[in-house]
C-alpha cells in the first residue's frame, strides 16, 4: 500500500549507519555499490516517507558470503506497517513562459486526453506546443512534423494501451525544470522518426517503458541532458520490445535542469539506457533493415546499465564517461546478473570506448566481448566477477588503460574461459600506489574450470606496472603464446607472469621481455620474467624471458613442478630459488618445499641458477640440466651437489617433443607465418588496409575450411574461424566453396561416368578394328559380316549414349537445383562493405548462369557484372576479376584501365563498349562441349531455321530444323562423334551463310 516514490534508505551495518539510494520500485529495494561488509551483520531498514519513520523489525539478515552488490530484495509484507493510500502531492505551479501556438492542460496538475485537446486531430507542421500536467494519448497520433513540444514543470505524456504516438523531426524539451517522461503503457507504441531526427531533452525518464510496450527509433534520434534517456523496470509481465536501432545519440553536455519537485537533485545525465529484468535487450543492430552510423553514448555518467537482464550490444561508441556524481558512474556497459554479449566483427560494427573510467563490467553472468577498441580508459577495460559456472570469452580486444586491462575475479569455477588475441597497453601516469596495476588479473578460489580455461596469444605492454599476468588461487588454466613487455622507472619489482597459490597450471611458449640493467642488485623486489610462489604441480615449457633480473623466480612451496626448455637471455639469474621465511626448519620439512622439480634451459646471463640455501634438502629429488658452460650455479658446484649438471646431449633441451609444440603453428603441411599473422591481425597491408585485410582473412578462412585439422587443439585458429563463421565474409566464402563443389561429381556419379567413358573407349577400339577389317575384306560375304557386326556395335553404342545422356541429365538437374538453393542463400546475405557487395553480386550471376548450365548473359546480368568489373581491383577485391571472367560470355569489348589504378594517376572510369549483336547472329554454348549444345538465336524466330553439322572434311553429320516462335534451343550431338573440331552452319533469310566452329571433347 506504499505510494510510489523515491525512498531514501538508511541501514545499519557493523555499528555504522549508511545511506543508499533506491529507485521507484514498489515494495522492492535495489542495493548497489555495497561491498566488503562485515560478516553476520543485521540490516535494519528505516523508510523515510512523508516525514514519518516506518521501522521494519530486522527484515534482512545477511550471513557470511552473501553480497548486497546490485541485488534485488523484496520487503516482507508482514514486517511493514501499512499506510493508507495517499493522494499524489500537488505539483508546484507552472512557470513556462514561452510563446506557443497550442497549449495542452490548464495547470501542472491537470490531466488531459489527447482526443479532447487543442492539438487533436492535427495541427500544422512547425507548430510550438506547450504541455502542462499530463497528456494521455488515447488515439493513434502523429505529432506535426518539425514541431517543438515544450514540457512545463513535471509534465508528462502517457501513451495509453492500444495506441501509438509518432514523433517525426520533433523536439521535446523542458522549460525551466525537468519534466517526467513519455510513459508507454502495456500494449502502447512509441515511434521516433524523421529526416533530421527527433530530439528529446531535459526529461527525468525521457522514455519510460512499461511491460508489453513497443518502442522504435530511427537513426539521428537524439537524447540530450536527460537523467535517464530510456528506462525500463520489469513489473512481472512480458518485457517491453525495443526494436533494433542504429545511429542514435545519447549525450550529456551540461548540468541538468532543477528537479520538478524542488527537492530531488540530479546533477548530471545518469545513463543512456537503464533496464532491469529484460530477457533480451539489443543495443544496436547488424541486420539489413537498420541503417545509420554507430549509436553513441557521450558525456553521460554511464552508457548502458542493466540488472538481471540479458544484453547484446553492437555498433556503439561510448565516450567521455566520468566517475562523478553517483555511486555507479564511469561505466560504458555494466550488467549485473544475466549475460552480456558485445560480439562485434573484425571489419565493422565493433564497439568503441574512448575516455571512459571503465569499459565493460559483468557481474555474475556469461560474458562475450570481441573486437572492441578501448582508449583513454582510467580504471579497467573489461571486468567480470562474482559468478560461477559461467562462460567467459574475451577475444581480440584492443585496450589502452592507465590502471588495469582485463580482470576475472571470483568466478570459480568457470564453465569455460577464453582470453585470447587481446592487445593491452597500460601506461601509469604516476607511480604505483596499491600495487594492483596489472595487464591481466585472474583471481579465484582454486576451483578448476568445468571445461577449460585458456589465456593465449595476448600482446601485453606495461610501463611501471607491477604485474603483467597475475594469477592468484587459480587452478587448471593454460597460458600459452602470450607476449609480455614490461618496463620501469618507478617500479622495480615487476613480474611478467606471476602465479600465487595457483596449482596445476601450464605455461607454454610465452615470451616476457623487460628493461633490467644487469648491474642492478637482486632481491625479491627485482624484475622477474616468470615467478611462482606457493604454486605446485606446474608445467612450464618453452617459455622465453629476456632482460630481467630473474628469468624464473621460484619461492616457497613449489613441489612437483615440471620446468623445462626455457631460454633466459640477458638475466642475472636464469633460475632463482628464493626461500624466505623457511630458515630454521628441519631438513625433512625444508625438503617439501622444492622437491621433485625438473628443469632444462639455457641463458646468456651472469649465472645459470641461484639457490638461496645450499642445503641439499631444499632441492631434493630435483634435477637441473643446462646445455653448456659457463652456466655456473650459485651456490657453486662444490662436491658437486648433484642437482645442477652441464649436459649438451639431452633431447629435453629443445621444444621439439614438448607438450607446447603441439599447440604451436607451422610444421610441414600446417599453416605458416602468414596464416598466423592474419589470424592474429598483425598484418599491415599498407594503403588498402580494409580491402587487403578482408582478402587475407577470407583466404585464411577458406584454408581452414579445407584443413579442419589445423583447428584441432589450436585455440588461435579456432577463435579466428569462429569469429568469422557467422559474418557475411564467412558466409560468402562458404557459398563460394559450395558453388565450386557443384562441379565435383559424387563418388557414385563418378563411377557411372567413368564406366560409360571406358565402355565408349572400348567400343571405339572395336569399331576401329572392324573398320580395318572392312578395308581389308576380299569378298562381299566378309564385308556383309563385318558390317553386320559393326552395326551391332553401333546400336550398343547408341544404347550406352542414351544411358549416359540420362545420367548426365540427372547430374545437371541436381546441380541446377543445388545452385538455386545457394542462390536463395546468397540473396539473404547482408554485405558489410564494397568487397562483400561485389562478391555477392558476382556470385549471384554465376549461380544464375554457369552453375545452372546457362552460358549466356541477359542485359541485367551484364549491367551488374560491368559495375563490378569496372572497379579498381585494389579496392573492389578479387570479385573484380571474377566479374570480368563472366563477362566473356557476352559480346563485350573490355578495357578497364588498370594501369591508372595501379599507379598514382587519378583513377579514370574505364570505357566499356558493347558490340551490337546482329539479330540473326546465333550464339553457341558451351564450347567446347561433350554431348549437348545450347543455342541462342538472338531473337524469336519468325520462320524455321535449318542447322547443318559438318566435319572438317565437309561430310554432313547431322541436320536440325529449328521451329519458329522460339529463341533458345537444346541440341543433342550425334553419339558417334569423336573428339575434335566441327562446323555448325546455317543460312540467313538473305541467303548469306554463317558458320560456327564447335569443339567436342571425348
Regions found by a protein language model. Give the residues of each.
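A glycine-anchored, Pro-Gly-centered beta-turn/N-cap motif
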Residues: 943, 967, 978-984
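C-terminal tail/sorting-segment detector
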Residues: 39, 979-1002
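Beta-strand-rich solenoid/repeat architectures in extracellular/passenger domains
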Residues: 120-123, 141-151, 165-179, 193-205, ...
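Extracytoplasmic/secretory-pathway proteins
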Residues: 99, 240, 255-259, 594-902
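Surface-exposed, proline-anchored Ser/Thr-rich loop/turn motifs
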Residues: 911-939, 949-956, 999-1002
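N-terminal domain-start segments of secreted/luminal proteins
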Residues: 74, 79-171, 905-907
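Residue-level detector of functionally pivotal "anchor" positions at catalytic/ligand-binding pockets or at interdomain
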Residues: 89, 96, 896-925, 940
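Extracellular beta-strand solenoid repeats
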Residues: 130, 136, 142, 150, ...
Amino acid at each position: 500500500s506504499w505510494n510510489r516514490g523515491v525512498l531514501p534508505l538508511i541501514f545499519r551495518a557493523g555499528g555504522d549507519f549508511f545511506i543508499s539510494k533506491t529507485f521507484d520500485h514498489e515494495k522492492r529495494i535495489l542495493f548497489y555499490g555495497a561491498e566488503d561488509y562485515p560478516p553476520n551483520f543485521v540490516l535494519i531498514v528505516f523508510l523515510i516517507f512523508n516525514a514519518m519513520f516506518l521501522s521494519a523489525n530486522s527484515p534482512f539478515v545477511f550471513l557470511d558470503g552473501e553480497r548486497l552488490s546490485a541485488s534485488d530484495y523484496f520487503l516482507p509484507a508482514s514486517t511493514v506497517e501499512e499506510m493508507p493510500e495517499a493522494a499524489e502531492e500537488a505539483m508546484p505551479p507552472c512557470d513556462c513562459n514561452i510563446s506557443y501556438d497550442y497549449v495542452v492542460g490548464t495547470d501542472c496538475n491537470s490531466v488531459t486526453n489527447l482526443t479532447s485537446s487543442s492539438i487533436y486531430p492535427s495541427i500544422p507542421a512547425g507548430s510550438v506546443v506547450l504541455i502542462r500536467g499530463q497528456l494521455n494519448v488515447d488515439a493513434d497520433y502523429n505529432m506535426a512534423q518539425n514541431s517543438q513540444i515544450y514540457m512545463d514543470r513535471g509534465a508528462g505524456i502517457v501513451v495509453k494501451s492500444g495506441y501509438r504516438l509518432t514523433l517525426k523531426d520533433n523536439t521535446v524539451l523542458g522549460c525551466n525544470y525537468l519534466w517526467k517522461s513519455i510513459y508507454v503503457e502495456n500494449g502502447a507504441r512509441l515511434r521516433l522518426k524523421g529526416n533530421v531526427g527527433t530530439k528529446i531533452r531535459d526529461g527525468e525518464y525521457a522514455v519510460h517503458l512499461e511491460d508489453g510496450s513497443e518502442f522504435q527509433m530511427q537513426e539521428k534520434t537524439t537524447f540530450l541532458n536527460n537523467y535517464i534517456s530510456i528506462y525500463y523496470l520489469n513489473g512481472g509481465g512480458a518485457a517491453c520490445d525495443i526494436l533494433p536501432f542504429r545511429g542514435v545519440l545519447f549525450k550529456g553536455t551540461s548540468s541538468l535542469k532543477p528537479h520538478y519537485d524542488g527537492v530531488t537533485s540530479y546533477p548530471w545525465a545518469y545513463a543512456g539506457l537503464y533496464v532491469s529484468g529484460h530477457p533480451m535487450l539489443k543495443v544496436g543492430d547488424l541486420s539489413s533493415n537498420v541503417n545509420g552510423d554507430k549509436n553513441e553514448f557521450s558525456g553521460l555518467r554511464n552508457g548502458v546499465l542493466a540488472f538481471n537482464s540479458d544484453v547484446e550490444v553492437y555498433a556503439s561508441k561510448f565516450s567521455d564517461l566520468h566517475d562523478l556524481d553517483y555511486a555507479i558512474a564511469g561505466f560504458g556497459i555494466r550488467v549485473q546478473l544475466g549475460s552480456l554479449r558485445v560480439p562485434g566483427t573484425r571489419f565493422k560494427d565493433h564497439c568503441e570506448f574512448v575516455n571512459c573510467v571503465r569499459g565493460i563490467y559483468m557481474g555474475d553472468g556469461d560474458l562475450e566481448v570481441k573486437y572492441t577498441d578501448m582508449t583513454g580508459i582510467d580504471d579497467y577495460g573489461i571486468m567480470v566477477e562474482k559468478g560461477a559456472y559461467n562462460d567467459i570469452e574475451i577475444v581480440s580486444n584492443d585496450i589502452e588503460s592507465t590502471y588495469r586491462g582485463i580482470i576475472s575475479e571470483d568466478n570459480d569455477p568457470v564453465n569455460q574461459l577464453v582470453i585470447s588475441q587481446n592487445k593491452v597497453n597500460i601506461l601509469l601516469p604516476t607511480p604505483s600506489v596499491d600495487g594492483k596495476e596489472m595487464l591481466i588479473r585472474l583471481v579465484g578460489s582454486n576451483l578448476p574450470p568445468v571445461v577449460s580455461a585458456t589465456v593465449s596469444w595476448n600482446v601485453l605492454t606495461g610501463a611501471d606496472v607491477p604485474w603483467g599476468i597475475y594469477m592468484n588461487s587459480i587452478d587448471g588454466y593454460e597460458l600459452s603464446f602470450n607476449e609480455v613487455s614490461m618496463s620501469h622507472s618507478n617500479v622495480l619489482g615487476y613480474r611478467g607472469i606471476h602465479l600465487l597459490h595457483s596449482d596445476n597450471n601450464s605455461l607454454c611458449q610465452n615470451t616476457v621481455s623487460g628493461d633490467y640493467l644487469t648491474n642492478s642488485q637482486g632481491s625479491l623486489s627485482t624484475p622477474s620474467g616468470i615467478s611462482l610462489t606457493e604454486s605446485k604441480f606446474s608445467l612450464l615449457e618453452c617459455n622465453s624471458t629476456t632482460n630481467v633480473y630473474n628469468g624464473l623466480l621460484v619461492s616457497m612451496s613449489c613441489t612437483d613442478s615440471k620446468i623445462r626448455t626455457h631460454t633466459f637471455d640477458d638475466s642475472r639469474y636464469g633460475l632463482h630459488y628464493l626461500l624466505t621465511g623457511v630458515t630454521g626448519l628441519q631438513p625433512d620439512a625444508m625438503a617439501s618445499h622444492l622437491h621433485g622439480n625438473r628443469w632444462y634451459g639455457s641463458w646468456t646471463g651472469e649465472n645459470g641458477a641461484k639457490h638461496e640455501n645450499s642445503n641439499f634438502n631444499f632441492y631434493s629429488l630435483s634435477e637441473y640440466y643446462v646445455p653448456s658452460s659457463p652456466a655456473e650455479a650459485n651456490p657453486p658446484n662444490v662436491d658437486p651437489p648433484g642437482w645442477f649438471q652441464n649436459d649438451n646431449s639431452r633431447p629435453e633441451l629443445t621444444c621439439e617433443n614438448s607438450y607446447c609444440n603441439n599447440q604451436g603453428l607451422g610444421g610441414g603441411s600446417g599453416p605458416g607465418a602468414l596464416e598466423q599473422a592474419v589470424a592474429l591481425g598483425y598484418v599491415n597491408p599498407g594503403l588498402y588496409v580494409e580491402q587487403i585485410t578482408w582478402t587475407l582473412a577470407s583466404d585464411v578462412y577458406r584454408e581452414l575450411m579445407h584443413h579442419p585439422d589445423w583447428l584441432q587443439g589450436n585455440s588461435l585458429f579456432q577463435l579466428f574461424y569462429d569469429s568469422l563463421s557467422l559474418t557475411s565474409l564467412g558466409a560468402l566464402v562458404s557459398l563460394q566453396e559450395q558453388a565450386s563443389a557443384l562441379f565435383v561429381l559424387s563418388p557414385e556419379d563418378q563411377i557411372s561416368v567413368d564406366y560409360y567413358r571406358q565402355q565408349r573407349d572400348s567400343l571405339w577400339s572395336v569399331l576401329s578394328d572392324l573398320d580395318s577389317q572392312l578395308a581389308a575384306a576380299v569378298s562381299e560375304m566378309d564385308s556383309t559380316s563385318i558390317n553386320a557386326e559393326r552395326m551391332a556395335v553401333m546400336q550398343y553404342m547408341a544404347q550406352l549414349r542414351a544411358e549416359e545422356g540420362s545420367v548426365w541429365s540427372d547430374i545437371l538437374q541436381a546441380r541446377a537445383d543445388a545452385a538455386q538453393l545457394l542462390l536463395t542463400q546468397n540473396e539473404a546475405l547482408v554485405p558489410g562493405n564494397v568487397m562483400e557487395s561485389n562478391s555477392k553480386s558476382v556470385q549471384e550471376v554465376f549461380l544464375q548462369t554457369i552453375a545452372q548450365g546457362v552460358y549466356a548473359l541477359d542485359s541485367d546480368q551484364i549491367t551488374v557484372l560491368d559495375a563490378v568489373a569496372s572497379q579498381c581491383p585494389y579496392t573492389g577485391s578479387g570479385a573484380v576479376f571474377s566479374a570480368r571472367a563472366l563477362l566473356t560470355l557476352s559480346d563485350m569489348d573490355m578495357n578497364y584501365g588498370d594501369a591508372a589504378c595501379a599507379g598514382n594517376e587519378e583513377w579514370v572510369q574505364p570505357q566499356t563498349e558493347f558490340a551490337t549483336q546482329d539479330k540473326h547472329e546465333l550464339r553457341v554454348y558451351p564450347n567446347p562441349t561433350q554431348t549437348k549444345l545450347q543455342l541462342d538465336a538472338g531473337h524469336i524466330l519468325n520462320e524455321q531455321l535449318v542447322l547443318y553439322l559438318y566435319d572438317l572434311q565437309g561430310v554432313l553429320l547431322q541436320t536440325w530444323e529449328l521451329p519458329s516462335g522460339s529463341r533458345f534451343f537444346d541440341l543433342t550431338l550425334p553419339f558417334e562423334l569423336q573428339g575434335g573440331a566441327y562446323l555448325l552452319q546455317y543460312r540467313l533469310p538473305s541467303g548469306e551463310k554463317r558458320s560456327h566452329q564447335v569443339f567436342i571433347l571425348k
